[in-house]
């Protein structure tokens, strides 16, 4: 009994030690002191070793508060508040790479009054500098910053002064003001943001600010060379900004320097003043104003992006105005662009005005982008695509002495005011629309573009949004109809919000109740008896849900047709393009693969479709526009699949931070349609919700996709054939191990296998592996595997543009650039690999002994698989022998690779040592021969060789 009592007492002591937490200011002081001395903080941790607040903390006694100097643990405020705190710096001076701080609320009774004295300075209520993760923190306190003479940069933010890693789900409601004087040096600036003042870091650090909002007013006055004032982040640098919104008023007053110079520039943005990384799905409601004795670049979303990047799916609702005494650029989305920035799918509703002075140089005002220019050093131009302006645009005379024919005049445009590029670069302002009023007291104005030089223009924005309405009394918040052009309802068509599926009624109507906080689209599963609506080659079976819509209605008008029983599908894998001028990938996609596919399509008498199996671009998100432009040259409906390289490679924590590019440029990431008798399912099997940059993405289906797949297939009878198309095969992929590549470890494997295992047949197509591969489970279950199902066949397709980063006419396995051609005859399916520049008969390359150097004939049969015959060697029309499987390196590719001297890229495109090679020793004295092989569909291919 005594031992039992001792053990119980010890356990109770441990529980108390692990569960104490921080419940008072004295506890907080003790915790901070222990941190700063490097002592144990276990007594303030819970059982998960997380430091926790257990109550609101009254900070009234904190007269000379000393913050945590450096924190590498996990701190959870559990939504408790810090109250009555008169701060001079943040709670944490620095959160390290391993640090996590969450759930702290700074009460409105708190204030931060910071004074810097010339040195580099950082201040934010939660952290002065963040190298770790801050999430779920809220600030209501006021921040006031002053600096009498800045010699170095100052960074002030509501949550963090500076961010190098991640800030998620944080809010600022407190007013932030900064008044700075200093030296007039270009490198000295003040950066102020509602969430973070500044950001930095290389792209590999995956720095991000996401799902954050600011409602606090921001006011900056300075006489420095640069002011950065942003609703979310001042100078975001390498921090990407996603799913953020600003409702706070932002004003910047940039004054002349001590020597009277007015060369300073105010950069002001509703989301960021300046950025070197992407901004997606961000929204500004706040009024923006730039004034003072200097000029400004001011935009509803960002003042000036300063790198090759994408700004997409953003909306500005707030008024944006520049009224300084020097030339300025004003835009509803972006003030000025001088880099290969791609602005896509953005909308402006705000009033845009230039009311400043611009006597000797150009000033601009426009609904989307004020000014686009192209420095001599640039290798690519800017794109503005699929953007719409509804706001009024105006500019005063500004004392400008030039007329509209002069580039230094004031320019005003509904979409872009002034756009200039070089004739040797691609640049465009295309597929954009304006219905706002455009007025200019002097200079030049245009309904869409004020002036364009060496810039491609034309087209109108897609009408692909549902209409925002109020919910119905029963809570229904998505509804509409599917009809023919004469108004006849189409019954039985499946409609989805990406999770649930419903069928249209007899009159073509449908309705559902959806979680609009995470619903991006309402779309159709296209039946085989309607024409697929396309725009520039892409199916338009969807409507985008408007931002902040409480409910939405979407009507679809379709044209009926007889279902096609016979047709062809081009299975194109991994174009994996980078922008023009990088590594020839875009060039090969443009000048070899796409033209070949279009020529093949044109030679066909029946319907042709294309399914592009992911890795459409290669990490560089601003390649999307050009990829799509080239894909549209294949004049048939093209169904796109998302791959791992189609994600922003900095994606962390949630898939939605990375797939937003695909959704913006293409549409839903999972969807279905019928062609003839077959049901096609497009899936995202790449799970990019990794917890850190050191983790890899995973394979499988996320919860939302699985829910949708179950709903979609509930309307598909089991006697149908299913064609699953994804980037990574959900079942079997090439692997040296017989049992190591069945993907049973993938997320939700058992669930999605159960959904498809009883269908008549399932063909699972994929890219990703950069090689041709076939596997039929019916030949293996019960023999060498227990996974999969006997109705499943897996087909992998080689990279269309050749070896990665090399992009030459043949790939690392010796296969020509190319794609699979799938022939469909009712329910009968066959396929073959079509090399670029070759016909169906070209299925192998045969090398003579003189070429191989070992007295043997070798044949590389790049699409050979189970079900094919053993290749046979013929001499003088007589079979001599079966050839032996001898995997090895393709001689032609080996020689081609030897000419490649890019040491950085060579490791990505080494000759494959396991090419599908067969060999035979010819009869002595033979002068020629022939290799014959028959594929699984009974097609015999021959190739002759001179010995």
Features from the language model and the residues they span:
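Hydrophobic beta-strand segments
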Residues: 493-497, 522, 871-873
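Surface-exposed repetitive/solenoidal architectures
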Residues: 20-468
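Extended active-site neighborhood of metal-dependent phosphoesterases/phosphodiesterases
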Residues: 527-535, 539-550, 621-717, 742-763, ...
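Structural motif
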Residues: 469-491
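Short, acidic Ser/Thr/Gly-rich low-complexity loop/linker segments typical of extracellular
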Residues: 496-515, 885
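N-terminal active-site segment of His-dependent metallophosphoesterases
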Residues: 477, 484, 526-624
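Binuclear metal-dependent phosphoesterase catalytic core
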Residues: 779, 783-864, 869-872, 915-923, ...
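Aromatic sugar-binding surface patches on proteins
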Residues: 890-919
């Amino acid at each position: 009994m005594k031992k039992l009592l001792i053990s119980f007492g010890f356990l109770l002591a441990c529980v108390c030690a692990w569960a104490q937490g921080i419940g008072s200011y004295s506890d907080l002081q003790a915790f901070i002191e222990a941190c700063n001395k490097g002592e144990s903080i276990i007594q303030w941790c819970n059982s998960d070793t997380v430091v926790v607040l257990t109550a609101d903390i009254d900070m009234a006694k904190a007269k000379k508060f000393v913050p945590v100097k450096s924190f590498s643990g996990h701190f959870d405020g559990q939504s408790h508040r810090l109250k009555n705190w008169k701060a001079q710096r943040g709670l944490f001076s620095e959160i390290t790479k391993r640090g996590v701080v969450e759930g702290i609320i700074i009460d409105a009774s708190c204030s931060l009054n910071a004074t810097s004295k010339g040195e580099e300075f950082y201040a934010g209520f939660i952290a002065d500098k963040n190298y770790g993760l801050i999430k779920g923190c809220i600030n209501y306190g006021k921040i006031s910053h002053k600096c009498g003479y800045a010699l170095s940069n100052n960074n002030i933010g509501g949550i963090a002064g500076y961010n190098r890693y991640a800030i998620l789900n944080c809010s600022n409601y407190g007013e932030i003001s900064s008044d700075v004087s200093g030296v007039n040096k270009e490198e000295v600036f003040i950066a102020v943001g509602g969430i973070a003042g500044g950001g930095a870091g290389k792209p590999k650090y995956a720095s991000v600010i996401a799902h954050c909002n600011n409602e606090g007013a921001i006011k900056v006055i300075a006489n420095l060379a640069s002011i950065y004032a942003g609703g979310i982040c001042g100078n975001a640098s390498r921090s990407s900004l996603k799913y953020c919104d600003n409702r706070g008023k932002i004003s910047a007053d940039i004054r002349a320097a001590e020597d009277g110079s007015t060369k300073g520039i105010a950069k002001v943005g509703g989301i960021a003043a300046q950025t070197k990384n992407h901004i997606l799905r961000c929204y500004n409601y706040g009024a923006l104003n730039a004034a003072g004795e200097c000029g400004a670049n001011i935009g509803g979303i960002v003042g000036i992006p300063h790198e090759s990047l994408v700004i997409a799916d953003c909306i500005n609702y707030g008024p944006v105005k520049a009224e300084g005494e020097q030339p300025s650029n004003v835009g509803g989305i972006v003030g000025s662009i001088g880099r290969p920035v791609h602005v896509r799918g953005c909308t402006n509703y705000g009033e845009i005005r230039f009311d400043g002075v611009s006597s000797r140089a150009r000033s601009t005002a426009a609904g989307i982008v004020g000014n686009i220019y192209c420095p001599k050093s640039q290798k690519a131009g800017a794109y503005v695509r699929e953007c719409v302006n509804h706001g009024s645009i105006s500019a005063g005379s500004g004392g400008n002495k030039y007329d509209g024919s002069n580039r230094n005049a004031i320019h005003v445009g509904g979409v872009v005011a002034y756009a200039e590029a070089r004739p040797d670069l691609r640049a465009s302002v295309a597929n954009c629309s304006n219905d706002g009023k455009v007025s200019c007291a002097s200079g030049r104005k245009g309904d869409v573009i004020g002036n364009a030089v060496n810039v491609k223009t034309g087209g109108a924005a897609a009408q692909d949004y549902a209409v925002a309405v109020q919910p119905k009394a029963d809570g229904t918040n998505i509804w509409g109809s599917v009809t023919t052009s004469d108004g006849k309802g189409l019954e039985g068509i499946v409609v989805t919000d990406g999770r649930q599926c419903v069928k249209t009624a007899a009159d073509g109507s449908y309705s559902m109740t959806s979680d609009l906080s995470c619903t991006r689209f309402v779309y159709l599963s296209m039946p085989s008896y309607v024409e697929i609506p396309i725009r520039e080659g892409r199916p338009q079976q969807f409507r985008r849900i408007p931002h902040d819509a409480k409910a939405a209605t979407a009507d679809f008008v379709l044209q009926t047709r007889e279902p096609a029983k016979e047709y062809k599908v081009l299975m194109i894998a991994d174009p994996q393009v980078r922008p023009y001028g990088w590594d020839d990938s875009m060039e090969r996609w443009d000048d070899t693969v796409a033209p070949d596919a279009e020529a093949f399509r044109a030679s066909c008498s029946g319907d042709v479709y294309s399914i592009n199996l992911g890795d459409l671009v290669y990490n560089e998100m601003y390649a999307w526009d050009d990829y799509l432009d080239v894909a549209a040259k294949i004049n048939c409906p093209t169904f796109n699949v998302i791959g791992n390289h189609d994600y922003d490679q900095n994606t962390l924590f949630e898939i939605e931070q990375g797939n937003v590019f695909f959704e913006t440029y293409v549409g839903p990431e999972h969807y279905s349609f019928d062609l003839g008798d077959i049901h096609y399912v497009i899936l995202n099997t790449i799970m990019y919700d990794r917890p850190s940059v050191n983790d890899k993405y995973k394979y499988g289906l996320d919860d939302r996709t699985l829910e949708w797949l179950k709903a979609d297939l509930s309307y598909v009878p089991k006697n149908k054939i299913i064609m699953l198309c994804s980037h990574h095969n959900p079942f079997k992929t090439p692997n040296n191990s017989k049992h190591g590549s069945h993907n049973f470890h993938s997320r939700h494997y058992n669930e999605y296998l159960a959904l498809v295992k009883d269908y008549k047949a399932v063909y699972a197509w994929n890219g990703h592996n950069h090689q041709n591969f076939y596997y039929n489970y019916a030949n293996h279950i019960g023999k060498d595997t227990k996974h999969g199902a006997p109705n499943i066949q897996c087909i992998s397709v080689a990279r269309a543009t050749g070896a990665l980063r090399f992009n030459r006419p043949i790939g690392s396995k010796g296969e020509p650039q190319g794609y699979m051609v799938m022939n469909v005859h009712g329910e009968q399916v066959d396929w073959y690999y079509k090399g670029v520049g070759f016909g169906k008969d070209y299925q192998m390359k045969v090398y003579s002994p003189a070429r191989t150097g070992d007295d043997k004939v070798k044949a590389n049969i790049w699409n050979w698989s189970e079900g094919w015959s053993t290749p046979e060697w013929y001499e003088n029309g007589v079979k001599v022998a079966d050839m032996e499987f001898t995997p090895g390196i393709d001689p032609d590719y080996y020689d081609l690779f030897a000419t490649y001297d890019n040491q950085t890229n060579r490791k990505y495109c080494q000759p494959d040592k396991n090419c599908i090679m067969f060999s035979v020793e010819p009869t002595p004295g033979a002068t020629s021969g022939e290799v014959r092989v028959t594929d699984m569909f009974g097609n015999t291919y021959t190739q002759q060789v001179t010995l």
